[in-house]
Amino acid sequence: MRIIIFTFLIIVLTLPSRSFAALDYGKQSLVGADFSGADLRGATFYLTDLQDANLSGCELQNATLYGAKLKDTNLSNSNLKEVTLDSAVLDGTDLSNTNLEDSFA
């Protein structure tokens, strides 16, 4: 009789912060994604599908959301200062307590 012992090494990476600043998410499908509390300053969401996504409490200053599909997306308590929202779809989007200072559509 042979006894085989398997040893598995599980590595869990814990990120010190949720920083995704200045990344390019252009033309991606991120339906239902959870970015809550993330640092997304300067990120590009050009023509990105973010329907039903959770972006609550996010730092999105200087981000580009040109043509983004934000239908039913949660952007509550987020900072959207100086964000480009041209052609973005905002039907049903939760913008409560959101800073939209100097943003334009």
Locate the predicted segments by residue:
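Bacterial N-terminal signal peptides
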Residues: 6-14
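Tandem repeat scaffolds
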Residues: 17-105
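Positively charged n-region of N-terminal signal peptides that target proteins for export
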Residues: 1-5
